[in-house]
Protein backbone atom coordinates (compact mmCIF):
# COMPACT_ATOMS: atom_id res chain seq x y z
CA UNK A 1 0.00 0.00 0.00
CA UNK A 2 1.13 3.53 -0.58
CA UNK A 3 0.64 6.61 1.54
CA UNK A 4 -1.32 8.39 -1.16
CA UNK A 5 -4.36 8.98 1.01
CA UNK A 6 -6.66 6.42 -0.69
CA UNK A 7 -8.12 3.95 1.78
CA UNK A 8 -10.72 1.19 1.48
CA UNK A 9 -11.66 -2.11 3.02
CA UNK A 10 -9.47 -5.23 2.73
CA UNK A 11 -10.04 -8.48 4.62
CA UNK A 12 -7.06 -10.38 3.25
CA UNK A 13 -4.43 -9.07 5.67
CA UNK A 14 -2.50 -11.56 7.79
CA UNK A 15 -2.90 -10.91 11.47
CA UNK A 16 0.85 -10.85 12.08
CA UNK A 17 1.28 -7.79 9.86
CA UNK A 18 -1.09 -5.45 11.67
CA UNK A 19 -0.56 -2.93 14.41
CA UNK A 20 -3.42 -1.65 16.53
CA UNK A 21 -3.66 1.52 18.59
CA UNK A 22 -6.50 3.20 20.40
CA UNK A 23 -7.45 6.61 19.08
CA UNK A 24 -8.93 9.34 21.29
CA UNK A 25 -12.31 8.98 19.55
CA UNK A 26 -12.72 5.39 20.72
CA UNK A 27 -12.04 3.81 17.30
CA UNK A 28 -9.33 1.30 16.50
CA UNK A 29 -6.85 2.15 13.74
CA UNK A 30 -5.50 -0.89 11.90
CA UNK A 31 -2.50 -0.41 9.63
CA UNK A 32 -0.60 -3.04 7.69
CA UNK A 33 3.19 -2.91 7.67
CA UNK A 34 3.46 -4.56 4.26
CA UNK A 35 2.84 -1.33 2.38
CA UNK A 36 5.55 0.38 4.41
CA UNK A 37 8.21 -1.53 2.54
CA UNK A 38 7.74 0.35 -0.70
CA UNK A 39 6.87 4.04 -0.16
CA UNK A 40 6.72 6.18 -3.28
CA UNK A 41 7.99 9.65 -4.04
CA UNK A 42 4.52 10.71 -5.20
CA UNK A 43 3.00 10.06 -1.78
CA UNK A 44 1.57 12.75 0.43
CA UNK A 45 3.66 14.62 2.95
CA UNK A 46 3.49 13.55 6.60
CA UNK A 47 2.01 16.90 7.66
CA UNK A 48 -0.92 16.35 5.25
CA UNK A 49 -1.79 13.09 7.00
CA UNK A 50 -1.50 14.31 10.57
CA UNK A 51 -4.92 15.90 10.56
CA UNK A 52 -6.72 12.65 9.65
CA UNK A 53 -4.91 9.90 11.49
CA UNK A 54 -3.24 9.26 14.80
CA UNK A 55 0.23 10.82 14.97
CA UNK A 56 1.66 7.86 16.86
CA UNK A 57 0.49 5.41 14.21
CA UNK A 58 1.90 7.61 11.46
CA UNK A 59 5.22 8.02 13.26
CA UNK A 60 5.57 4.26 13.75
CA UNK A 61 4.68 3.69 10.10
CA UNK A 62 7.35 6.10 8.88
CA UNK A 63 9.89 4.62 11.30
CA UNK A 64 9.17 1.10 10.06
CA UNK A 65 9.31 2.30 6.48
CA UNK A 66 12.70 3.94 7.04
CA UNK A 67 14.08 0.81 8.71
CA UNK A 68 12.86 -1.33 5.83
CA UNK A 69 14.75 0.85 3.35
CA UNK A 70 17.92 0.58 5.45
CA UNK A 71 17.52 -3.21 5.67
CA UNK A 72 17.26 -3.85 1.93
CA UNK A 73 13.55 -3.66 1.07
CA UNK A 74 14.23 -1.62 -2.07
CA UNK A 75 17.80 -2.23 -3.18
CA UNK A 76 20.11 -5.18 -3.69
CA UNK A 77 23.10 -5.52 -1.37
CA UNK A 78 26.53 -4.94 -2.89
CA UNK A 79 28.74 -7.97 -2.19
CA UNK A 80 31.96 -7.87 -4.28
CA UNK A 81 33.30 -11.10 -2.72
CA UNK A 82 30.14 -13.00 -3.68
CA UNK A 83 30.24 -11.61 -7.21
CA UNK A 84 33.89 -12.69 -7.46
CA UNK A 85 32.96 -16.27 -6.49
CA UNK A 86 29.99 -16.36 -8.86
CA UNK A 87 32.23 -15.37 -11.77
CA UNK A 88 34.66 -18.19 -10.99
CA UNK A 89 37.37 -15.82 -9.82
CA UNK A 90 37.53 -13.80 -13.03
CA UNK A 91 35.61 -10.56 -12.29
CA UNK A 92 37.15 -8.03 -9.90
CA UNK A 93 35.40 -4.94 -8.50
CA UNK A 94 37.07 -1.52 -8.35
CA UNK A 95 35.20 1.04 -6.23
CA UNK A 96 35.68 4.80 -6.52
CA UNK A 97 33.92 7.52 -4.59
CA UNK A 98 31.73 9.92 -6.61
CA UNK A 99 29.93 12.33 -4.28
CA UNK A 100 27.12 12.72 -1.74
CA UNK A 101 23.46 13.57 -2.39
CA UNK A 102 20.03 13.35 -0.77
CA UNK A 103 17.97 10.24 -1.55
CA UNK A 104 14.20 10.75 -1.21
CA UNK A 105 11.85 7.76 -0.91
CA UNK A 106 8.34 9.12 -0.56
CA UNK A 107 8.24 11.31 2.57
CA UNK A 108 11.57 9.87 3.76
CA UNK A 109 14.84 11.73 3.24
CA UNK A 110 18.24 10.06 3.47
CA UNK A 111 20.67 12.96 3.56
CA UNK A 112 24.43 12.70 2.97
CA UNK A 113 24.04 9.45 1.05
CA UNK A 114 27.39 8.50 -0.45
CA UNK A 115 27.55 7.28 -4.04
CA UNK A 116 30.34 5.14 -5.46
CA UNK A 117 31.21 4.08 -8.99
CA UNK A 118 32.04 0.37 -9.39
CA UNK A 119 34.01 -0.82 -12.38
CA UNK A 120 34.23 -4.56 -13.06
CA UNK A 121 37.25 -5.93 -14.92
CA UNK A 122 39.29 -9.11 -15.31
CA UNK A 123 42.33 -7.49 -13.70
CA UNK A 124 42.84 -7.22 -9.93
CA UNK A 125 44.90 -4.05 -10.46
CA UNK A 126 43.19 -0.69 -10.28
CA UNK A 127 43.02 1.03 -13.70
CA UNK A 128 45.35 3.90 -14.49
CA UNK A 129 44.62 7.14 -12.73
CA UNK A 130 43.84 10.01 -15.05
CA UNK A 131 47.01 12.09 -15.44
CA UNK A 132 47.06 15.83 -15.74
CA UNK A 133 46.71 16.99 -19.33
CA UNK A 134 49.63 19.30 -20.02
CA UNK A 135 52.13 20.12 -22.73
CA UNK A 136 54.06 16.97 -21.76
CA UNK A 137 51.21 14.62 -22.61
CA UNK A 138 48.41 16.45 -24.41
CA UNK A 139 47.30 13.46 -26.49
CA UNK A 140 46.19 11.36 -23.53
CA UNK A 141 42.86 9.60 -23.64
CA UNK A 142 41.33 6.76 -21.64
CA UNK A 143 41.42 4.27 -24.50
CA UNK A 144 45.04 4.81 -25.58
CA UNK A 145 47.02 5.59 -22.46
CA UNK A 146 50.65 6.52 -23.01
CA UNK A 147 52.63 7.10 -19.79
CA UNK A 148 54.87 10.07 -19.31
CA UNK A 149 58.26 9.65 -20.96
CA UNK A 150 60.02 11.08 -17.90
CA UNK A 151 58.87 8.06 -15.89
CA UNK A 152 60.39 5.68 -18.43
CA UNK A 153 63.78 7.41 -18.74
CA UNK A 154 66.41 6.49 -16.10
CA UNK A 155 67.26 9.05 -13.46
CA UNK A 156 66.15 12.65 -13.73
CA UNK A 157 67.46 13.21 -17.25
CA UNK A 158 64.90 14.20 -19.81
CA UNK A 159 65.02 11.95 -22.83
CA UNK A 160 63.77 13.91 -25.81
CA UNK A 161 63.65 10.81 -27.99
CA UNK A 162 61.23 9.06 -25.64
CA UNK A 163 59.21 12.25 -25.38
CA UNK A 164 58.80 12.42 -29.14
CA UNK A 165 57.95 8.74 -29.23
CA UNK A 166 55.23 9.15 -26.57
CA UNK A 167 53.43 12.01 -28.23
CA UNK A 168 51.29 11.42 -31.26
CA UNK A 169 52.41 13.32 -34.36
CA UNK A 170 50.51 16.53 -34.82
CA UNK A 171 48.39 16.45 -37.97
CA UNK A 172 49.48 18.74 -40.77
CA UNK A 173 46.62 20.58 -42.39
CA UNK A 174 47.25 22.12 -45.78
CA UNK A 175 44.79 24.81 -46.74
CA UNK A 176 43.45 24.34 -50.28
CA UNK A 177 44.55 27.04 -52.71
CA UNK A 178 42.05 29.82 -53.25
CA UNK A 179 40.15 29.52 -56.50
CA UNK A 180 40.49 32.29 -59.03
CA UNK A 181 37.77 33.60 -61.32
CA UNK A 182 39.50 31.87 -64.22
CA UNK A 183 38.75 28.49 -62.64
CA UNK A 184 35.02 29.02 -63.06
CA UNK A 185 35.22 30.11 -66.71
CA UNK A 186 34.79 27.71 -69.58
CA UNK A 187 37.53 29.45 -71.54
CA UNK A 188 39.88 31.73 -69.54
CA UNK A 189 39.79 35.37 -70.46
CA UNK A 190 36.20 35.50 -71.68
CA UNK A 191 33.61 37.36 -69.59
CA UNK A 192 31.21 35.12 -67.69
CA UNK A 193 27.54 35.93 -68.06
CA UNK A 194 25.91 36.01 -64.60
CA UNK A 195 23.07 33.60 -64.00
CA UNK A 196 21.07 36.13 -61.98
CA UNK A 197 20.31 39.23 -64.03
CA UNK A 198 18.58 42.48 -63.19
CA UNK A 199 15.57 41.36 -65.18
CA UNK A 200 15.20 38.21 -63.07
CA UNK A 201 15.45 40.26 -59.88
CA UNK A 202 12.76 42.67 -61.10
CA UNK A 203 10.56 39.74 -62.08
CA UNK A 204 11.01 38.19 -58.60
CA UNK A 205 10.23 41.55 -56.96
CA UNK A 206 6.98 41.88 -58.87
CA UNK A 207 6.06 38.28 -58.08
CA UNK A 208 6.71 38.91 -54.36
CA UNK A 209 4.47 41.98 -54.41
CA UNK A 210 1.69 39.98 -56.01
CA UNK A 211 2.03 36.78 -53.97
CA UNK A 212 2.48 37.20 -50.16
CA UNK A 213 3.60 33.56 -49.89
CA UNK A 214 6.71 34.24 -51.97
CA UNK A 215 7.36 37.40 -49.93
CA UNK A 216 7.26 35.44 -46.66
CA UNK A 217 9.53 32.76 -48.12
CA UNK A 218 12.07 35.41 -49.12
CA UNK A 219 11.99 36.84 -45.60
CA UNK A 220 12.68 33.41 -44.10
CA UNK A 221 15.52 32.71 -46.52
CA UNK A 222 17.11 36.10 -45.78
CA UNK A 223 17.09 35.25 -42.06
CA UNK A 224 18.71 31.87 -42.70
CA UNK A 225 15.57 29.91 -41.76
CA UNK A 226 14.62 28.65 -45.20
CA UNK A 227 14.00 24.97 -45.82
CA UNK A 228 15.65 23.16 -48.75
CA UNK A 229 12.36 23.20 -50.62
CA UNK A 230 12.05 27.00 -50.19
CA UNK A 231 15.61 27.53 -51.39
CA UNK A 232 14.86 25.45 -54.48
CA UNK A 233 11.75 27.55 -55.08
CA UNK A 234 13.90 30.70 -54.99
CA UNK A 235 16.30 29.00 -57.41
CA UNK A 236 13.43 28.32 -59.80
CA UNK A 237 12.21 31.92 -59.63
CA UNK A 238 15.64 33.46 -60.27
CA UNK A 239 17.43 31.06 -62.60
CA UNK A 240 14.91 28.54 -63.82
CA UNK A 241 14.05 24.93 -63.16
CA UNK A 242 16.57 23.31 -60.83
CA UNK A 243 18.49 20.24 -61.95
CA UNK A 244 19.28 19.16 -58.38
CA UNK A 245 17.44 16.11 -56.99
CA UNK A 246 14.71 16.73 -54.47
CA UNK A 247 15.93 16.71 -50.85
CA UNK A 248 15.14 13.51 -48.98
CA UNK A 249 13.72 13.90 -45.53
CA UNK A 250 15.13 11.51 -42.93
CA UNK A 251 12.50 9.14 -41.58
CA UNK A 252 12.44 8.01 -37.98
CA UNK A 253 13.37 4.36 -37.53
CA UNK A 254 10.46 2.07 -36.64
CA UNK A 255 9.89 1.63 -32.95
CA UNK A 256 11.12 -1.69 -31.61
CA UNK A 257 8.14 -3.64 -30.40
CA UNK A 258 8.55 -5.95 -27.45
CA UNK A 259 7.19 -9.37 -28.36
CA UNK A 260 7.52 -11.93 -25.59
CA UNK A 261 6.25 -15.47 -25.22
CA UNK A 262 6.23 -16.41 -21.53
CA UNK A 263 5.18 -19.86 -20.37
CA UNK A 264 4.75 -21.41 -16.94
CA UNK A 265 8.31 -22.75 -16.94
CA UNK A 266 9.69 -19.22 -17.22
CA UNK A 267 7.52 -18.11 -14.30
CA UNK A 268 8.63 -21.06 -12.16
CA UNK A 269 12.30 -20.36 -12.85
CA UNK A 270 11.76 -16.69 -12.03
CA UNK A 271 10.05 -17.59 -8.76
CA UNK A 272 12.74 -20.14 -7.81
CA UNK A 273 15.51 -17.63 -8.45
CA UNK A 274 13.81 -15.15 -6.11
CA UNK A 275 12.95 -17.69 -3.39
CA UNK A 276 16.49 -19.13 -3.41
CA UNK A 277 18.05 -15.67 -3.73
CA UNK A 278 20.04 -16.64 -6.81
CA UNK A 279 22.48 -13.96 -7.91
CA UNK A 280 23.64 -13.10 -11.39
CA UNK A 281 27.22 -12.13 -12.14
CA UNK A 282 27.40 -8.35 -12.33
CA UNK A 283 29.64 -7.00 -15.07
CA UNK A 284 30.63 -3.72 -16.72
CA UNK A 285 29.84 -1.04 -14.12
CA UNK A 286 27.45 -0.12 -11.31
CA UNK A 287 26.62 2.69 -8.90
CA UNK A 288 26.39 1.77 -5.23
CA UNK A 289 25.01 3.79 -2.32
CA UNK A 290 25.90 4.02 1.34
CA UNK A 291 23.38 5.50 3.79
CA UNK A 292 24.73 7.67 6.57
CA UNK A 293 22.47 5.82 9.06
CA UNK A 294 23.97 2.44 8.07
CA UNK A 295 27.51 3.01 6.78
CA UNK A 296 28.52 -0.66 7.02
CA UNK A 297 26.45 -1.79 4.03
CA UNK A 298 26.43 -0.66 0.41
CA UNK A 299 23.40 -1.03 -1.87
CA UNK A 300 23.32 -1.32 -5.66
CA UNK A 301 21.57 1.46 -7.54
CA UNK A 302 18.79 -0.02 -9.77
CA UNK A 303 20.26 -0.27 -13.25
CA UNK A 304 16.93 -0.75 -15.04
CA UNK A 305 15.44 2.49 -13.73
CA UNK A 306 13.52 4.89 -15.94
CA UNK A 307 15.08 8.31 -15.44
CA UNK A 308 13.17 11.59 -15.67
CA UNK A 309 14.28 15.11 -14.79
CA UNK A 310 12.27 17.30 -12.41
CA UNK A 311 12.70 20.99 -13.25
CA UNK A 312 11.80 24.00 -11.13
CA UNK A 313 10.20 26.48 -13.52
CA UNK A 314 10.43 29.38 -11.07
CA UNK A 315 14.16 29.06 -10.49
CA UNK A 316 14.76 27.67 -14.00
CA UNK A 317 17.03 24.87 -12.86
CA UNK A 318 17.07 21.11 -12.46
CA UNK A 319 15.70 20.27 -9.04
CA UNK A 320 15.76 16.46 -8.82
CA UNK A 321 16.36 13.22 -10.69
CA UNK A 322 13.33 10.93 -10.54
CA UNK A 323 13.87 7.20 -11.05
CA UNK A 324 11.10 4.64 -11.51
CA UNK A 325 11.91 0.94 -11.11
CA UNK A 326 10.37 -2.38 -10.08
CA UNK A 327 10.95 -4.48 -6.96
CA UNK A 328 10.08 -8.17 -7.16
CA UNK A 329 9.19 -10.23 -4.07
CA UNK A 330 8.03 -13.89 -3.82
CA UNK A 331 4.86 -14.88 -1.98
CA UNK A 332 3.78 -18.06 -0.23
CA UNK A 333 1.46 -19.17 -3.05
CA UNK A 334 4.37 -19.45 -5.51
CA UNK A 335 3.81 -16.07 -7.04
CA UNK A 336 5.84 -12.92 -7.55
CA UNK A 337 4.71 -9.44 -6.50
CA UNK A 338 5.77 -6.53 -8.68
CA UNK A 339 6.02 -3.27 -6.73
CA UNK A 340 6.56 -0.13 -8.78
CA UNK A 341 8.78 2.23 -6.78
CA UNK A 342 9.89 5.81 -7.35
CA UNK A 343 12.85 7.56 -5.74
CA UNK A 344 14.32 11.02 -6.19
CA UNK A 345 17.90 12.28 -5.99
CA UNK A 346 18.36 15.85 -4.76
CA UNK A 347 21.35 18.07 -3.97
CA UNK A 348 23.49 16.27 -6.54
CA UNK A 349 26.58 17.39 -8.44
CA UNK A 350 27.06 17.34 -12.23
CA UNK A 351 29.44 14.39 -11.86
CA UNK A 352 26.81 12.30 -10.06
CA UNK A 353 24.14 13.34 -12.55
CA UNK A 354 26.24 12.22 -15.53
CA UNK A 355 27.01 8.92 -13.79
CA UNK A 356 23.30 8.21 -13.14
CA UNK A 357 22.36 9.17 -16.70
CA UNK A 358 25.06 6.83 -18.00
CA UNK A 359 23.82 3.97 -15.81
CA UNK A 360 20.13 4.27 -16.69
CA UNK A 361 20.63 4.61 -20.47
CA UNK A 362 20.21 0.87 -20.96
CA UNK A 363 20.15 -1.04 -24.21
CA UNK A 364 17.11 -2.61 -25.83
CA UNK A 365 18.11 -5.99 -24.35
CA UNK A 366 18.00 -4.51 -20.83
CA UNK A 367 14.54 -3.07 -21.43
CA UNK A 368 13.43 -6.39 -22.87
CA UNK A 369 14.62 -8.21 -19.76
CA UNK A 370 12.87 -5.78 -17.41
CA UNK A 371 9.66 -6.04 -19.43
CA UNK A 372 9.84 -9.83 -19.28
CA UNK A 373 10.23 -9.77 -15.50
CA UNK A 374 7.33 -7.37 -15.18
CA UNK A 375 5.04 -9.63 -17.22
CA UNK A 376 6.03 -12.70 -15.20
CA UNK A 377 4.91 -11.01 -11.98
CA UNK A 378 1.66 -9.63 -10.59
CA UNK A 379 0.86 -6.10 -9.56
CA UNK A 380 1.39 -4.89 -6.03
CA UNK A 381 -1.34 -6.02 -3.61
CA UNK A 382 -3.08 -3.09 -1.99
CA UNK A 383 -3.19 -2.99 1.77
CA UNK A 384 -5.35 -0.24 3.19
CA UNK A 385 -5.94 1.48 6.49
CA UNK A 386 -9.43 1.21 7.89
CA UNK A 387 -11.19 2.71 10.91
CA UNK A 388 -13.61 0.39 12.75
CA UNK A 389 -16.23 1.92 15.00
CA UNK A 390 -16.93 -0.03 18.15
CA UNK A 391 -20.54 -1.18 18.42
UniProtKB/Swiss-Prot annotation:
Its main subcellular localisation, reduced to a broad class, is: nucleus
GO BP of this protein: chromatin remodeling; transcription initiation-coupled chromatin remodeling
The compartments listed are: Nucleus; Cytoplasm
List compositional bias (Polar residues) regions by residue number. Answer: 1-13
Q: Which GO terms describe its cellular component?
A: cytosol; nucleus; Swr1 complex
Keyword Metal-binding listed? The answer is: no
- State any single GO MF term: ATP hydrolysis activity
Going by the UniProt record, its keywords in alphabetical order are: Chromatin regulator, Cytoplasm, Nucleus
Region named Disordered: 1-27, 170-190
Subunit-level organization: Component of the SWR1 chromatin-remodeling complex.
The family assignment reads: Belongs to the SWC3 family.
Q: What is the purpose of this protein?
A: Component of the SWR1 complex which mediates the ATP-dependent exchange of histone H2A for the H2A variant H2A.Z leading to transcriptional regulation of selected genes by chromatin remodeling.
Query: Know the name of this protein?
Result: SWR1 complex subunit swc3
